Amino acid sequence: MRGLLRASSLLLCGVILIQLLAAQIHAQSKKPKSPWPTLTGDPPLVIARGGFSGLFPDSSYDAYNFAILTSVPDAVLWCDVQLTKDALGICFPDLTMRNSSSIEAVYPTRQKSYPVNGVPTSGWFTIDFSLKDLKDVNLIRGILSRSEKFDGNSNPIMTVQSVSTQMKPSFFWLNVQHDAFYAQHNLSMSSFLVAASKTVLIDFISSPEVNFFKKIAGRFGRNGPSLVFRFLGQDEFEPTTNRTYGSILSNLTFVKTFASGILVPKSYILPLDDQQYLLPHTSLVQDAHKAGLEVFVSGFANDIDIAHDYSFDPVSEYLSFVDNGNFSVDGVLSDFPITASASLDCFSHVGRNATKQVDFLVITKDGASGDYPGCTDLAYKKAIKDGADVIDCSVQLSSDGTPFCLSSIDLGNSTTVSLTAFRNRSTTVPELGSLGAIYTFSLTWAEIQTLTPAISNPYRVTSLFRNPKQKNAGKLFSLSDFLSLAKNSTSLSGVLISVENAAYLREEQGLDVVKAVLDTLTQTGYSNSTATKVMIQSTNSSVLVDFKKQSQYETVYKVEENIRDILDSAIEDIKKFADAVVIQKLSVFPVAQSFITTQTNVVEKLQKSQLPVYVELFQNEFLSQPYDFFADATVEINSYITGAGINGTITEFPFTAARYKRNLCLGRKETIPYMAPAQPGALLTLVSPTAFPPAEAPNPVFTDADVTEPPLPPVTAKAPTSSPGTPSTNAQAPSGQTRITLSLLLSVFAMVLASLLLL
């Protein structure tokens, strides 16, 4: 009987266990699959290298504090641990202290030389100073291309313990770069870390030295920090095994014996060719995950020249590592954690057809001219593909009156005309502000079509070049071609046609650009009621008045000057002939020494008068943005859209602006810190007033006198022209002085010289 009861009990227990197991399996099957193909399925970590070191001195209080304020809640603070003479740990980016501190000014005679990994190195080493010695030493920028304005602040060196207690980070990462060096000088990094772990919560420890991990193995217990092996350049030698990092990479199972993760440069995963374009990704992430290793990536910063494939957009770079359809790394080490945070939380796993969270017009400037030569077929097609709402055409006229799209009336700004036989068409036209140029009205349309387009490089002097492989790609577009392309697009809401120099062309060249535009609109099937909205833009009120008289197209008045205010009477004048206004970025957020000083009320006043406001010019290059936008075009767009409330952006990089519309973070009830618009003047409060020169004169106020213009003059009779290919008299403005004779002599000389060289 007792055995029967026991059997029944066992059977009952078995049934219960089966039911519990089935319930667990059912629950697991219903659990949603993580969108993150990381090792754990958790979102990648944002690791702030030295805090917000892209702006503030690395490892300073301000850098760490700002990183916490602007990043995801679980952001990791990174500390490069160095040991002082008295074996205390400080957060400092390098062994030597000259580049990132005021050590040389405080102790000018205490420079020494030591071998570091076998290389003789001179400098002010942390091992020669006690913590007390360093109390008067301040942290400064370590990268000279970054702002020096924060160097004048009091930025004392922080210890590992002070970062932990003052910052209270969600996660704390200690990087040990030179354990072997400290050991040579009788300082034990492992002993310091073990002692520190009793009062400091350490979540990650990394090092590029294999022997270091052998020293600390088992010293932190089962719940100790994650250990991460840091890879340096593949051809560099790991100092304790005398093997290259590339050879260690081929044996990840070996790495797994002492570490739970690896930290690698970006190039280990997405290598670049010699022209800085992406090559196919490696299998490192998948291989490491198979070996049970997390993969963290270093080298992210907004103010460096990244792969051309990203179009100077740091968000695109982050997404290529975490949201590419193949893999995701487990964390990114960044100098600008705000961008890493927004990339992961706001823009990851967002398709191109995702719901728009905000509505504004994305208007191009010469198409996607940041990626291809402006006003070419390729620039316009990419703009449409990238999600532009409105594509634009800056209309120019050839000598035979054909309207076409080009950024400037000066062919030399957008083509390689100066390298062709047409260089003898150069003229000087004071009315157009030139000392000598080859103008569109100096060549026929047939001649212009033979020219090679040239991409714009506004930051050439700093060696920031746009898409060099495609710098001369595409073909120039007539206005007719442009309108036909737009009409056949299902995604565009409109076109913007810019008209300038109309008075000069009528008076001096006998060309009527207003008539040419209106005729082409009619010929290409556009009418006043067409589904594709037509906007006519000009800086001249007289041009827009003329268009208003002859059509019902929407007119847009462009204010070229940077202004601090606009009179109500001027707005009333504008409303008589314009339906919208374009203003410059600095007319919204004035800037001094690359810092935003305030916000004007120009946008608010125009919108109160029912005039939509479009703002130009948005570019992705970090040099185009004040420091308040953290070298991130998305932060800039966010500040103008949600902060200033503008109605549209005029941009050379429409993809970045169009992607912003689908920003998931904009759909949330509360504004998250990494999607908060810049507060005008806030960053300036962190800068010492002595760091600035005397204030410059403020921008002017826009008045009625700036709006009022006489009517457009009538078209004058055009002088007879010479045959194509010869020095053309029609290229010479009556008030200009030609340079044809000199150009012709130079051309002949060049041909004679070339003939002699061929002999």
Swiss-Prot record:
Glycans are attached at residues 99, 186, 242, 251, 326, 353, 413, 424, 488, 528, 540, 647. Expressed in roots, shoots, rosette and cauline leaves, stems, flowers and siliques. It catalyses: a sn-glycero-3-phosphodiester + H2O = an alcohol + sn-glycerol 3-phosphate + H(+). It is an enzyme of class 3 (hydrolase). It is a single-pass type I membrane protein. Keywords: Cell membrane, Cell wall biogenesis/degradation, Glycerol metabolism, Glycoprotein, Hydrolase, Membrane, Repeat, Signal, Transmembrane, Transmembrane helix. Residues 702-734 are annotated as: Disordered. Its main location: membrane. Involved in primary cell wall organization. Required for the accumulation of crystalline cellulose. Belongs to the glycerophosphoryl diester phosphodiesterase family. This is Glycerophosphodiester phosphodiesterase GDPDL3.
